[in-house]
Amino acid sequence: IREPVITNDQVKLYINGWEDRSKLAPRFELTPGATISPASGTVRDFTTPQTYVVTSQDGQWKKTYTVRFITDLLTEYHFENVEYYTFEGVNKFEKLYELDTDGSKTEWSSGNPGYMIASQAAKPKDFPTAQDDEGYIGKCAKLVTRSTGAFGKMLNAPIAAGNLFLGNFTVELSDMAKSTRFGLPYTSKPVAVVGYYKYKPGNVLIDKYSKEIPNQSDTFDIYAVMYESTKDVPYLDGTNIKTHPNIVMMAQIKERKATDQ
């Protein structure tokens, strides 16, 4: 019901709930000369995740992928689980995830990959999006606006706001707002979005040229968007997530205020 989501070693395919996951035979398109084991088109039981090994044409390179077929998505999120994105053996930033009904992961996305480019020496807890211990019950997601330093100023993006969303983040340096690819398939009609938050505004509000905007205060936003995904519009991004004509429903917080409760 949408394009597969392919990350470093994971492949997620979304299908309708009435499909029988115990007998599926996915077919994979590989680079010329590469092989896959088990073979493309093999019938397998995807009620649990299955692994495939891809071997390069010269046989010198092998990589294992975990493939999942997903029918039902979570509707409750607790931010209790976290793992690290690692680069050259170093834990760079935290990735929050939820456990699906079959024990597999639904990962939250954020703008942390973009911030990693701007602030390569930052520790995981210094990134805009990280896990925190001070949740209403248990853990929570902590979103903080951070400076992107000299690199960010060159791109007229002097700050990076903490954010959290379902979907994918692919860095687009020419237009960072297009880096966010929002959304996962839902087949039910949502009724409401309910949760808890704390918020403290920054001391100074600046524009993309790092100039202070007088007599205005920082603010935040919480919203949920349901939109129709098509071949021409497979996803919405930061440039059109609130304005695109494919939007079917939207919920957005109305009363935004600073609170420590």
Specify the residue positions occupied by each region the protein language model found.
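Beta-rich interaction/scaffold domains
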Residues: 1-77
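Short beta-strand segments enriched in hydrophobic/aromatic residues
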Residues: 145, 197-199, 226-228
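Extended low-complexity, serine/threonine- and proline-enriched intrinsically disordered segments
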Residues: 210-237
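Extracellular/lumenal carbohydrate-interaction signature centered on repeated Trp-anchored short motifs
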Residues: 159-175, 180-193
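Short carbohydrate-recognition loop motifs
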Residues: 131-151
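Extracellular carbohydrate-recognition regions
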Residues: 70-115
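Extracellular carbohydrate recognition and processing domains
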Residues: 231-261
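Extra-cytoplasmic beta-strand recognition segments
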Residues: 79, 180-215
